Amino acid sequence: MLGEKHVGSSLENLNDFNADFQNFISRFAWGEVWSRPGMPRHTRSLVTIAMLLALGREDELRMHLRACFNNGVTKDDLKELILHCSLYAGLPAANAAMHMAEEVFANLGIAPQKLSEQQLSQEQMNQE
């Protein structure tokens, strides 16, 4: 779900204080809930991102924005999800998520392309 890089990082950060908690997360969240039949991982990713956006859980949101591509989520899926969440979670939360998504895209080498002059003109006309 989160990819081998995240798993490796989690294992490297285990210590005598957090090991039981990390084990619980691995067994319950990933082993039980995320592995259940009945809802595709693509959908689980989108639902999770929407909830984290609404709750303002930025660290977890960044992690799931990176990981969602492992579950078949696309940039267009995220764009529509964030736009939709702006109605129910508020514009500030959605705006923060939009910026986080753009940062994640840049880190993954899939940064959005700038609009052409023609596209910019069309956008301006649409706003008038």
Predicted regions and their residues:
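Acidic, glycine/proline-rich low-complexity segments that act as flexible tails and inter-domain linkers
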Residues: 1-42, 70, 96-128
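A short, ordered amphipathic alpha-helix with a cationic face
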Residues: 19-20, 52-56
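Short, low-complexity cationic-aromatic patches
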Residues: 37-45, 57, 75-79, 92
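Short, structured motif recognition centered on aromatic/hydrophobic residues
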Residues: 44-52, 81-82
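Buried hydrophobic packing segments
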Residues: 50-51, 64, 85, 101
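Alpha-helical transition-metal enzyme core signature, strongest for iron centers
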Residues: 54, 88-91
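Mid-chain, well-packed structural core segment of small domains
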Residues: 54-79
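Substrate/cofactor-recognition hotspot
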Residues: 84, 91-95
